[in-house]
Amino acid sequence: MKGARLFVLLSSLWSGGIGLNNSKHSWTIPEDGNSQKTMPSASVPPNKIQSLQILPTTRVMSAEIATTPEARTSEDSLLKSTLPPSETSAPAEGVRNQTLTSTEKAEGVVKLQNLTLPTNASIKFNPGAESVVLSNSTLKFLQSFARKSNEQATSLNTVGGTGGIGGVGGTGGVGNRAPRETYLSRGDSSSSQRTDYQKSNFETTRGKNWCAYVHTRLSPTVILDNQVTYVPGGKGPCGWTGGSCPQRSQKISNPVYRMQHKIVTSLDWRCCPGYSGPKCQLRAQEQQSLIHTNQAESHTAVGRGVAEQQQQQGCGDPEVMQKMTDQVNYQAMKLTLLQKKIDNISLTVNDVRNTYSSLEGKVSEDKSREFQSLLKGLKSKSINVLIRDIVREQFKIFQNDMQETVAQLFKTVSSLSEDLESTRQIIQKVNESVVSIAAQQKFVLVQENRPTLTDIVELRNHIVNVRQEMTLTCEKPIKELEVKQTHLEGALEQEHSRSILYYESLNKTLSKLKEVHEQLLSTEQVSDQKNAPAAESVSNNVTEYMSTLHENIKKQSLMMLQMFEDLHIQESKINNLTVSLEMEKESLRGECEDMLSKCRNDFKFQLKDTEENLHVLNQTLAEVLFPMDNKMDKMSEQLNDLTYDMEILQPLLEQGASLRQTMTYEQPKEAIVIRKKIENLTSAVNSLNFIIKELTKRHNLLRNEVQGRDDALERRINEYALEMEDGLNKTMTIINNAIDFIQDNYALKETLSTIKDNSEIHHKCTSDMETILTFIPQFHRLNDSIQTLVNDNQRYNFVLQVAKTLAGIPRDEKLNQSNFQKMYQMFNETTSQVRKYQQNMSHLEEKLLLTTKISKNFETRLQDIESKVTQTLIPYYISVKKGSVVTNERDQALQLQVLNSRFKALEAKSIHLSINFFSLNKTLHEVLTMCHNASTSVSELNATIPKWIKHSLPDIQLLQKGLTEFVEPIIQIKTQAALSNLTCCIDRSLPGSLANVVKSQKQVKSLPKKINALKKPTVNLTTVLIGRTQRNTDNIIYPEEYSSCSRHPCQNGGTCINGRTSFTCACRHPFTGDNCTIKLVEENALAPDFSKGSYRYAPMVAFFASHTYGMTIPGPILFNNLDVNYGASYTPRTGKFRIPYLGVYVFKYTIESFSAHISGFLVVDGIDKLAFESENINSEIHCDRVLTGDALLELNYGQEVWLRLAKGTIPAKFPPVTTFSGYLLYRT
């Protein structure tokens, strides 16, 4: 018994300590890949067998499965114990034995990997090749796919029907699957299935949900080349008497076979990321997530309820309940199988114990001589060795079985524990959701009954703030409008007063006429009474007078009619004036808007120019003044030393004649020291002058080097852009994988169910779901109302203010609400931009103040130096005057002369330095004046431009294009200046950074090895290297000497590609390098299979340009009018199209000409690729003709394509006729 216990303990320790961490399972299948393995399911009787066809190559990984007689039993037991009930074929459902299609085959492979992978296992694929280690994340990822495949087996059966191997069931299954699963289940599908799928896709129109993917693959082909050699033949008899006979040679052709890889590409339309289904629609999960995120933004409590609603949506669905019950039954089946296995293990342990006890009994009973003789025979070495080997083999077999069983036990127990924890969490979430839903119902009822005070207060505050802002912003324009209104009212009052005066004068004249008429009548009556007898004589006079009166009255009536007409004319003029005023107001507003936009643009350009100029000034000051500062500090230190020495010497010189004899011996030493210091000062000043000269020289050299550096910078920027693009593509794939993984896990959480079936909870869930669904539209309405309130608040407040201000204005002069809104928007924009411009101007003023402060500091330093020099000179002169009586007067005089001369030289140099600083200040002031002049000239230009536009309205399009061409060289000059400053800064920072880099490289020598060890990919690196060499062949540094592929430089089967100045080799596995001579890996390593190909996203590259100007000089045709430029690869300034990707491009061009003879070329990198020509042979008469052409070229990254006119002219025409277009067909 003790031995049995030790045996069991050893086996358990072995399986627990080693089997869990280093258990390796290897499965193989015959290389045909078509052998079918029959596997009985858990719930099916033994006569019902389901056949699974396992493919050797899938989209995920190519895994060859090898079965050994030792592993088949364990594998069969695993498959029997772990097949879920969704894969079983029950006779009641009527499901037939059918072979899976291509999509189902891929799922079968994933299922096998999921069911048989341990927790931390390293699985060997492709025996004889490298072993691929799978991490926990990839295992979980595959497990999620296996669980999804179990769920979707039922959907495949329902959609596909009872289809067999054909493509009906496969397409149906693919239609209902996620995009990630369709990508995995592609595999090596049948041709019929693919053709059907493509036909259904390409018949429909392409929208934004579809993306083009290019399928590329390398196919090796054999090329036959005939190598011709000429062999001289024998000399025959010569028939000529004089001269030499010709030699005859024989032609021999030898066939030479070569391998060449051709790139085979095909275009395929697929759903973009985030879309799925046959019509590439948005996923349901993403739509729900969008809805829930919009709801969550409105209110936090509402968002929480919606999120919990999303988790509990499946509580009332019968399908979800059925899935949950199926999974519970499946877990119960697993538990029963585990119990059976534990019973079997206990039985085997009991059998071992019984055999051990029987052996002990036999040994105790049989103590005879025969048994002892047998024991003596058994004590020989050979028998002992045999017994040991047998025991070891049996022990190993038993140990392996125990490891497998214990690993399975751990796996099942861990899965059960995970399921139990997940169900517990779900129950907790359900309870929390029920409680939160009840609380939310109360909260929603409270919210519906009463509006929140906080929102109302916020709205009031917001309205008050908006009113204040409106009053601040609209005071000036409203005052101006009021002034105009008062002016117009005064003009109208004047016109009314004039009309009133006119009417009064008319009334007065009419009254006077009536009075005159009455007087005449009275005089006539009196004359009739007095002169009755003389009536006959007067009657003739009266008739004449009456006729004249009638004529006068007619004339006056005509005058009155004319006056009324004049009044009507004046009224119509007043109306016309009001209408014209309104029109002028509208025109003035439009002009003001245009002028404001132009002023903004001009101000922006001026600010940019001033900023660039200030940057240049700051850099020049930093380059010139900072080293001068260091030199001046050194000068001040040396002068301080001089003053200190002179102070030490001063008491010695002031002493009496007793010390003069000793001083005579010490004076030469001190003079030598002073001379050395003065020499140092002169050398420092000379070095300063030399540094200034070198700075000027370097500045000139840098100006010359800027043009060369521009091209290098552009190339580097393009290379970095490509690398960033590749990195972004990789990160997008990683993000898509992560999103798919999260979505898969989210789907798994929905499929989990509780162990206990509580009917009351389900009824509550349904009722709560109905209540929540009733609340959702109300929440939507609330969100919409709040958004409309927030968005339209400013507009309504503005309308109210405008209505108040316009209440007293007459109806004729009221302005429209739209005009006020436009004015309000314009004033808001102008105020914000003015604030920005004020900030920028304040920054500029601060910088100018800093420069002035720096110059003042330098001036003060120079004055300090001059004062120090004078202080050092004064005591020395005084001491010399006191002690100039005694001997050695000549020596002292000589020394004084020397010192005076040197100090004078120092003074002259300091004066020279001050002059240099003065010249620097002059240059600074000149630069500032230049900036001001430039700004004034630009403002004058801006003022004159609208006048020119008014005068040249028919040619306004040509004028705009001319302006763009005028502005572009100025911008280029500015950019060149900025680039020159950049290069200066880089050159200055390089020597300091190189030393730091060398130090950091010494410290980080050990780091790259560790990083490379961590970053070992599971795939061969040669595939990546080959792809990079095919794409970015322009990144290689080309030599100056041109060498083509005519010499066949690529070795070891590599293919040669001609470039602009050199060639590149696309090497075969496992070689790399410039000539395919460097070997990467061992010979036993497998080559990458390029025949399967790969899918890549096809970028959008297309351009369309036209030519509107006239062209009379031969050269490159500059198409100035650019309509389409996807990819930003065509530059109108040069007329060249730069290739952004390696691939096949299509170009088309049309050229119009009136000349008798026109010709030109389509140029690729300076080489004439195609020619176009047209000539009128009969006569030199000019005629209108249009040339068209197209080309399909395979081009490399960095190459340039343009059109060159060799002979003839192109007329100016608008709309244009001469065009040039091109686009990327597909990448290679």
From Swiss-Prot:
GO molecular function, one term: calcium ion binding
Name by which UniProt lists this protein: Multimerin-1
PANTHER family (UniProt xref): EMILIN ELASTIN MICROFIBRIL INTERFACE-LOCATED PROTEIN ELASTIN MICROFIBRIL INTERFACER (PTHR15427), MULTIMERIN-1 (PTHR15427:SF3)
SMART domains (UniProt xref): C1Q, EGF, EGF_CA
Xref: Pfam families: C1q, EGF, EMI
Subunit structure, as described in the record: Multimeric. Composed of varying sized, disulfide-linked multimers, the smallest of which is a homotrimer. Proteolysis of the promultimerin in the N-terminal region, leads to the mature p155 form that is stored in platelets. Interacts with factor V/Va.
Keywords: Coiled coil, Disulfide bond, EGF-like domain, Glycoprotein, Secreted, Signal
Reported impact of T216A: Strongly reduced protein secretion
Stretches assigned to coiled coil: 333-365, 400-430, 503-523, 580-650, 675-726, 819-869
Principal subcellular localization: secreted
Disease listed for this protein: Deficiency in multimerin-1 due to proteolytic degradation within the platelet alpha granules is associated with an autosomal dominant bleeding disorder (factor V Quebec).
Organism, scientific name: Homo sapiens (Human)
Listed Polar residues bias regions: 79-89, 187-200
Domain called EMI: residue spans: 207-282
Tissue: Synthesized by endothelial cells and megakaryocytes. Stored in platelet alpha granules and endothelial cell Weibel-Palade bodies, following activation of these cells, it is released and attached to megakaryocytes, platelets, endothelium and subendothelium of blood vessels. Not found in plasma. Found in vascular tissues such as placenta, lung, and liver.
Domain C1q: 1096-1228
Motif mapping: Cell attachment site: 186-188
Modification after translation: The N-terminus is blocked.
GO cellular component: extracellular matrix; extracellular region; multimerin complex; platelet alpha granule; platelet alpha granule lumen
Signal peptide range in chain numbering: 1-19
InterPro entries the record matches: C1q_dom, Collagen/C1q_domain, EGF-like_Ca-bd_dom, EGF-like_dom, EGF-type_Asp/Asn_hydroxyl_site, EMI_domain, Tumour_necrosis_fac-like_dom
SS bond partners: C211-C272, C238-C245, C271-C280, C1045-C1056, C1050-C1065, C1067-C1076
Compositional bias segments (type: Gly residues): 160-175
Residues glycosylated per entry: 21, 97, 114, 120, 136, 216, 265, 344, 431, 507, 541, 576, 618, 680, 729, 783, 816, 828, 840, 921, 933, 942, 981, 1020, 1055, 1075
Alphabetized Gene3D superfamilies for the sequence: 2.60.120.40, Laminin (2.10.25.10)
Role noted for this protein: Carrier protein for platelet (but not plasma) factor V/Va. Plays a role in the storage and stabilization of factor V in platelets. Upon release following platelet activation, may limit platelet and plasma factor Va-dependent thrombin generation. Ligand for integrin alpha-IIb/beta-3 and integrin alpha-V/beta-3 on activated platelets, and may function as an extracellular matrix or adhesive protein.
